[in-house]
């Protein structure tokens, strides 16, 4: 019997846009640790830029809102952290740079009809520096913990705003706090890179141990009723990591997972009922999920489930309480993702055969809004478990109304404009205050009866509109079934998916050097090459057939630090390298590959076919020409582009373009006919060269990305367009689509932000499908976009997530080697610190026995040169040859016969004779008579028996019975 978690099939989907919260304004405060929080009534957002304002949106007011957003003008400086009171859903607590903690009672402002709030109910002013983190006790009412940059930890009683305990931590200030299940202990991380288990009443550090060793702040979360907690931070190598710890032993971690090299601080969210962990860092575009179940193991399983990708970077995430979920639709969790302009709900569901019954195996009792202890009881030393409540709607009627404030009957209710929703313009949806209660009830009944029959019980019950005009008018008929745009764009590649090959196909036991300035992996139809750790710039060139564990790795020895290299697609045995000593070398791999190293002797391959010296500084990039044979393009630190003819040995330099670039060149690419060269530079410009003209070669240029890191650009096949990726002034990664014929306009056809990660992205374009793949150095994913002539021209498809950071990615160019029988449209080789992993991008199809000619057009022949180097330098222009990818034993899908129709099942009707038999008639008559008067009619009964006996003897034939 397999021991697997029951939540392993949890699938997350982004809700359709009708359920988003648009037109929000998130803060730009980089010091803010919290951007969004939610409970079953409200969604709170760190609003605007460094204004100390919190925006409040009713949970049910999704979609376009009419009127002003309710704002809490909380602090004179930026809000760093804020929390809803778990036992009072209309109370919010904020912490700020101004060293204060404030308590806000939302219900009082709602009663008054105000649209903003600026007077706090309680102000706690015990800290002397900015408050870094606050955390409510999970069992005791009004008990709050806070830590500050003044190196103190304080415990507050918010019933009166008094400071109850205060402890100093001279080793360094604490940056993150989390309570254990019964609210007796705190786990904390600090700037001294230590983890601490602290007794919340005495301030004693029960356990102290080394935590995440990165210089950036880490976050911590206690894993419910387990004796474990998790930290999310950075390693010494500045890589983001998750670390699992036991609260009983902080000397060493139980398990750690390295994520990527992004700089965004991770926000961990833990569901203690389902034992699921959700993470997303600032600037990340995806939400990752981990199963932490302890059903079969002592320690949490810590296994990753399917992530939820998107094309929008995140500012922060939060989870909705279980009480607000649609349990009858098997909604396991709902995560809110805050972006610069929207709040995006992400629902996590599980498939069930029937949703008519409550899935009690998936929804255990959850924490209620009733405290187990008062603040006085907790301060006196008492401990209790949280009070739990059932999620079954039949056992516990959960109030789904947005505003359940208990208003006095004689108290007038003022209208708050921020509650009004314009999901519909129908005036009949607005309940006027002047209408009588019977009229309102009739309208409510009509609305309920007209609702969709497919609505879940939870959604249906929420259609009843409160009689108070302050309740929002929302359309609850919208179903949470994932992304369903109003108009679905038709595309053959919408469902493209990526998958890694089996581990037996990996190349392992490698020590890959990821510090090369440009290429970290290259591949052609015979070899894959990666730079290795070692002296002399070793470059491992491994035959593709030599899969598995590499015992002896054959290497080319450059003689200096390797900067860049390339493998020829035309002559697969040629390798070109560029190094720190400004040499450009060409090697020819012997037949069968580089000889293996022998015992006690290093036989690195050093035989060169050519050694060019032309650049005054180190060589930055090396690229073989894609259409002309033996033409090499290089760029150097001297900001010069050179073209070499490999047929002429040491005197092979043919063309040179100097005094054009004013900063380091970051990418070089050649168009599909091979006559124009595209460059990107750190001087924030993109240039097109026609290298064989007499006008200096420069054809056009434009300013692209404004960031200091520079970008990379590629030609988009026969379209004549250009796709570039880089950074903006805010260090956000972005892309731009350009028309090469109109660069002088300075305006791209399309552009958008990607995320806040720091890795340089390399774009790979597939001319046959129009799909572009974006792979960032240090990322753990590859994003896919489709580019066509439909606005906005660049359409996000999906992303492949590997779970471990990548050093580099290379695209396999030989399309005729694709496995068309599995609908493979692209293949990549992905390198990590120790492995090379092949990846396949496939399109799901039903009839894979036929050649899918709609997704496999004739492809460019990349392994055969179009012309010689002499012809190219003489100015020849020749279009590449195209070949079919169709195997000889397959039939085109367009020529295939229609699929066989399923045979209809015919039910043969049978006539059944329902005429009662003789015995049935006899017994029926006898029973009727005996029931009427059993005591006085025995003689009649005997007579009837005698008569029927005569019938049985043949006096009446069988055919006379009707």
UniProtKB/Swiss-Prot annotation:
Sequence segments annotated as region (Disordered): 417-478, 910-936
Pfam family, any one: DUF1899
Positions of region (Coronin 1): 1-438
GO MF terms, alphabetically ordered: actin filament binding
Biased composition (Basic and acidic residues): 434-448
Matches recorded under SUPFAM superfamilies: WD40 repeat-like
UniProt GO cellular component terms: cell leading edge; cell projection; cortical actin cytoskeleton; cytosol; phagocytic cup
Region (Linker), start-end ranges: 439-483
Biased composition (Low complexity): 449-473
Keywords assigned: Actin-binding, Cell projection, Cytoplasm, Cytoskeleton, Phagocytosis, Repeat, WD repeat
InterPro entries on file: Coronin (IPR015505), DUF1899 (IPR015048), G-protein_beta_WD-40_rep (IPR020472), WD40/YVTN_repeat-like_dom_sf (IPR015943), WD40_repeat_CS (IPR019775), WD40_repeat_dom_sf (IPR036322), WD40_rpt (IPR001680)
Cellular localization per UniProt: Cytoplasm; Cell projection; Cytoplasm, Cytoskeleton; Cytoplasm, Cell cortex
Stretches the record annotates as Coronin 2: 484-962
PANTHER family in alphabetical order: CORONIN, CORONIN-7
Family to which this protein belongs: Belongs to the WD repeat coronin family.
Main function: Involved in phagocytosis and cell motility. Binds to actin filaments and protects them against depolymerization.
Domains (record comment): Seems to consist of two repeat of a full-length coronin.
Name under which the protein is recorded: Coronin-B
Organism: Dictyostelium discoideum
Gene coding for it: corB
């Amino acid at each position: 019997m397999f021991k697997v978690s029951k939540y392993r099939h949890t699938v997350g989907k982004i809700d359709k846009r009708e359920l988003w919260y648009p037109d929000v304004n998130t803060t730009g405060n980089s010091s803010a640790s919290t951007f969004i929080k939610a409970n079953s009534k409200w969604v709170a957002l760190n609003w605007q830029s460094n204004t100390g304002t919190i925006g409040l949106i009713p949970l049910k007011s999704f979609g376009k809102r009419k009127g002003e957003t309710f704002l809490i003008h909380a602090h004179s400086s930026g809000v760093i952290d804020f929390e809803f009171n778990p036992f009072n859903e209309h109370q919010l607590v904020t912490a700020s740079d101004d060293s204060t903690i404030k308590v806000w009672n939302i219900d009082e402002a709602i009663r008054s009809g105000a649209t903003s709030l600026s007077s706090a109910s309680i102000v706690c002013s015990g800290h002397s520096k900015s408050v870094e983190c606050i955390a409510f006790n999970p069992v005791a009412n009004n008990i709050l913990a806070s830590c500050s940059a003044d190196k103190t930890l304080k415990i507050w009683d918010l019933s009166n705003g008094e400071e109850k305990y205060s402890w100093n931590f001279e080793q360094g200030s604490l940056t993150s706090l989390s309570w254990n299940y019964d609210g007796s202990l705190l786990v904390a991380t600090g700037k001294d890179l230590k983890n601490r288990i602290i007794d919340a009443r005495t301030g004693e550090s029960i356990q102290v141990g080394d935590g995440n060793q990165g210089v950036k702040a880490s976050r911590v979360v206690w894993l419910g009723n387990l004796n474990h907690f998790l930290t999310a931070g950075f390693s010494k190598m500045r890589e983001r990591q998750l670390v699992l710890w036991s609260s009983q032993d902080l000397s060493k971690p139980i398990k750690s997972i390295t994520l990527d090299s992004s700089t965004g601080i991770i926000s961990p969210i833990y569901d203690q009922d389902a034992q699921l962990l959700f993470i997303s860092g600032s600037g990340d575009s995806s939400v990752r999920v981990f199963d932490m179940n302890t059903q079969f193991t002592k320690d949490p399983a810590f296994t990753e489930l399917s992530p939820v990708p998107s094309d929008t970077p995140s500012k922060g995430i939060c989870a909705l309480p279980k009480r607000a979920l649609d349990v009858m639709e098997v909604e396991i969790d709902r995560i809110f993702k805050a972006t610069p302009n929207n709040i995006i709900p992400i629902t996590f569901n599980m498939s069930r055969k029937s949703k008519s019954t409550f899935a009690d195996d998936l929804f255990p009792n959850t924490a209620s809004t009733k405290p187990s202890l008062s603040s006085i009881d907790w301060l006196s030393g008492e401990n209790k478990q949280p009070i739990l409540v059932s999620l079954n709607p039949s056992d516990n009627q959960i109030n789904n109304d947005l505003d359940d404030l208990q208003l006095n009957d004689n108290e007038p209710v003022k209208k708050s404009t921020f509650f009004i929703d314009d999901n519909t313009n129908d005036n009949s949806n607005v309940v006027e205050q002047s209408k009588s209660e019977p009229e309102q009830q009739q309208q409510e009944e009509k609305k309920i009866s007209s609702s969709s029959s497919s609505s879940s019980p939870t959604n249906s019950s929420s259609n009843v509109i409160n009689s108070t005009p302050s309740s929002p008018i929302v359309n609850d008929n919208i179903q949470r079934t994932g992304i369903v745009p109003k108009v679905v764009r038709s595309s053959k590649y919408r469902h493209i998916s990526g998958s890694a090959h089996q581990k037996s196909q990996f190349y392992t036991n490698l020590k890959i050097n990821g510090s090369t300035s440009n290429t970290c992996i290259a591949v052609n139809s015979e070899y894959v090459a990666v730079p290795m750790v070692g002296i002399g710039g070793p470059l491992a060139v491994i035959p593709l057939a030599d899969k598995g564990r590499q015992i002896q790795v054959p290497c080319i020895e450059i003689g200096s630090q390797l900067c860049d290299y390339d493998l020829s697609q035309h002559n697969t045995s040629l390798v070109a390298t560029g190094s720190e000593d400004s040499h450009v070398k060409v090697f020819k791999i012997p037949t069968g590959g580089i000889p293996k190293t022998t015992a006690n002797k290093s036989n690195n391959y050093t035989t060169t076919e050519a050694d060019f010296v032309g650049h005054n500084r180190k060589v930055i990039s090396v690229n073989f020409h894609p259409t002309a044979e033996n033409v090499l393009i290089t760029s150097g630190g001297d900001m010069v582009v050179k073209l070499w003819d490999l047929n002429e040995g040491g005197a092979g330099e043919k063309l040179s373009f100097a005094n054009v670039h004013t900063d380091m060149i970051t990418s070089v690419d050649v168009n599909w006919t091979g006559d124009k060269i595209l460059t990107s530079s750190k001087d924030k410009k993109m240039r097109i060269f026609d290298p064989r003209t007499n006008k200096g070669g420069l054809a056009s240029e434009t300013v692209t990305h404004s960031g200091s890191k520079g970008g990379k650009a590629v030609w988009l096949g026969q379209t004549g367009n250009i796709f570039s990726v880089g950074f903006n002034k805010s260090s956000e990664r972005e892309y731009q689509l350009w028309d090469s014929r109109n660069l002088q306009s300075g305006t791209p056809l399309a552009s958008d932000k990607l995320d806040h990660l720091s890795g340089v992205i390399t774009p790979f374009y597939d001319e046959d499908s129009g799909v572009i793949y974006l792979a960032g150095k240090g990322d753990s994913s590859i994003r896919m976009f489709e580019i066509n002539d439909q606005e906005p021209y660049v359409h996000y498809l999906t992303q492949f997530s590997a779970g471990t950071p990548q050093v580099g990615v290379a695209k396999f160019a030989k399309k005729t080697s694709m496995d068309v029988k599995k609908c493979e449209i692209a293949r990549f080789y992905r390198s990590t610190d120790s492995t090379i992993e092949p990846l396949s991008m496939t399109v799901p199809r039903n009839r894979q026995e036929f050649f899918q000619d709609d997704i496999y057009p004739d492809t460019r022949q990349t392994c055969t040169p179009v012309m010689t180097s002499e012809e190219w330098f003489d100015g020849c222009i020749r279009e590449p040859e195209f070949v079919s990818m169709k195997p000889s034993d397959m039939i085109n899908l367009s020529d295939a016969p229609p699929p066989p129709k399923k045979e209809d099942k015919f039910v043969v009707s049978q006539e059944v004779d329902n005429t009662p038999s003789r015995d049935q008639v006899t017994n029926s008559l006898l029973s009727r008579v005996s029931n009427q008067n059993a005591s006085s009619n025995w003689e009649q009964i005997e007579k009837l028996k005698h008569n029927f006996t005569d019938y049985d003897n043949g006096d009446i034939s069988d055919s006379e019975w009707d």
